[in-house]
């Protein structure tokens, strides 16, 4: 009986401890222009812990870079931003994103042309959707 409780405690400790220690870690997905440029810009922001380039959307499973860059897969070049929300808010990341890209260009960003380079935020919560929509409307209203 003693071993049962010890095993149960250790299981709970191992399974739930990482979640407790990473409670302030959040993830956001942004796309706009070349993902390497966006990756470098997000990596400079205090509170950002990791930035990884990749693809989202599309109709091809496990697309190759050459196919995505041709615009034939329907994917967007995106970055996954892992951040500590005690050090930087999602809203601050969105404001930084609007400055990194050209949100008024429907066919890419700067010299990167095509749907795969279009500006997009893939939100993963209602809060992220609200912040993304609200800040875009404010940007539109500012006519900047």
Located regions from the model:
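Positively charged n-region of N-terminal signal peptides that target proteins for export
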Residues: 1-7
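Bacterial N-terminal signal peptides
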Residues: 7-19
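Flexible coil/turn and secondary-structure edge motifs
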Residues: 22-144
């Amino acid at each position: 009986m003693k071993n049962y409780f010890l095993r149960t405690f250790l299981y709970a400790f191992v399974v739930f401890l990482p979640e407790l220690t990473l409670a302030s870690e959040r993830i956001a997905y942004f796309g706009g222009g070349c993902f390497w440029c966006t990756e470098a810009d997000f990596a400079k922001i205090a509170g950002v812990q990791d930035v990884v380039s990749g693809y989202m959307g599309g109709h091809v499973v496990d697309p190759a870079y050459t196919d995505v860059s041709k615009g034939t897969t329907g994917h967007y070049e995106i970055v996954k931003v892992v951040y500590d929300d005690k050090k930087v808010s999602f809203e601050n990341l969105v404001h930084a994103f609007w400055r990194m890209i050209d949100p008024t260009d429907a066919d890419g960003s700067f010299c990167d042309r095509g749907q795969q380079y279009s500006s997009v935020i893939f939100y993963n919560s209602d809060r992220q959707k609200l912040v993304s929509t609200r800040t875009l409307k404010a940007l539109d209203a500012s006519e900047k």
